[in-house]
Each structure stands twice: as C-alpha cells, then as structure tokens.
Amino acid sequence: VAGNSGPTSGQEITWEEITEHAKSPEPIVEITTATKRKRRVFTFGEKDFRKAININRPTKLMLSFVDYLKYDDRHKTSWDSLTQETKDWITTLESKMNVFFNFLSTGPNPEHTIIRKTNGELAVKAQIGQ
C-alpha cells in the first residue's frame, strides 16, 4: 500500500525498522509498481487476521515474508532450518489464533516455500513448477 488504504489493527512501521529487526545486512524495502514510492508496511494485525479467518473460513493458510522476521531465514526450505525465534513466533501465533500455517514463504521465488503437514512437521520441499 502506498496511499491510504483504510484502517488496520497493525501499527505502521518503517522499512528501516524491519531491516533492523530482521538483522538484515542489506536494506529491506518494497517499492510500488505504479508510483515507484515506498510501500507502506505494518506490524502483523492480529485483529484483522482473526476477522479475516472468521469471515473466510480458509482450509489452508500461507504466511508470507517469514524472512522479514529474521534475515537468517531467507530462502530456507525446511521448518527445521528456520531460526528458533521464528519457529517460536509462528507457533505462538498459531496457538493464539487457533490456526495452522500450511505454507511459509521465505523469499521472493516459489522454491522459497516451506510446506508443512498439519502436525507441524515438514512435509516436503516445495517443488512448484516441476
């Protein structure tokens, strides 16, 4: 989002804060396609997430931008290879929201996807497009 997109339960933060929190050696930033401005970014909005879950009743969930939590998780392809801090954050969120993330995105490409079984164990490495 580059402009005002309405209310959100997340708190607006800066790309610099994300870069610092993730301990990234390089700046993390997203630019909008049309205006070429920095995309607005927010903390995870638990209230919005819960509302979306209640309205949509999804059967599978994907959590994107896991690599924005910790740069060390960038391009990981297995649950076991994620940092303990990231795994703890995800499992705490899952428990709190009573959900399970079947897919975790750790980078910009399809192969940077972790597919999990419902018991939280790694199912298979994503083989998208093969």
Give the label of every model feature segment.
Residues V1-Q130:
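Non-transmembrane, aqueous-exposed alpha-helical and coiled segments at domain scale
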